[in-house]
Amino acid sequence: MHLTGPTLLSLLAALLVSLGLLLWYPTKTRTKDKLLKDLNTLKINTVNLLNQVLKTDTTKLVDFHIANVHCDGIIDRLLSPDELAQLYHKDYPLYKRLVGCGYTKTVGLLHGFALWASETKTRDVSSLKYFIDCISTLDWKEPNLFAGFHTTESKVKKCIV
């Protein structure tokens, strides 16, 4: 069988496209897996912190309020609240995609629960319930919610009693 120039080029192009897809797909999957692993670790650490403060198991409570993130490899790590606020100005399209896939709300709530555990004075379930009711009213799309997350002016911190 004798291959002509155009046929050979077509086969070579198809081979390169296939190879590119084979190399790209696992990278995207690894990125998604890394983010999910990091989120799960943060969730476990948050639950452990809340359990220490409240002296009760909060796993179901946190699982109920923390939605699954479906970002499909958009980002491969957890961002701090300050990094999320900066991202809005540095890469607005990426920020909007993170809002759309639930990333900002999930990461914001996890950081918020950790902040509550370290800042609450009453250390009881009613204080946590008040906090949850308060942060449930927040719009996790707004970048100013993440700017100054740990300051007294923070909307999240104002929910802590």
Curated annotation (Swiss-Prot):
Subcellular location(s) per record: Membrane
Domain of life: Viruses
One GO cellular component, as annotated: membrane
Transmembrane region(s): 5-25
Principal location class: membrane
Membrane topology: Single-pass membrane protein
Annotated keywords: Membrane, Transmembrane, Transmembrane helix
UniProt record similarity statement: Belongs to the IIV-6 203L/325L family.
Protein name: Uncharacterized protein 085L
Species of the source: Invertebrate iridescent virus 3 (IIV-3)
Lineage of producing organism: Viruses, Varidnaviria, Bamfordvirae, Nucleocytoviricota, Megaviricetes
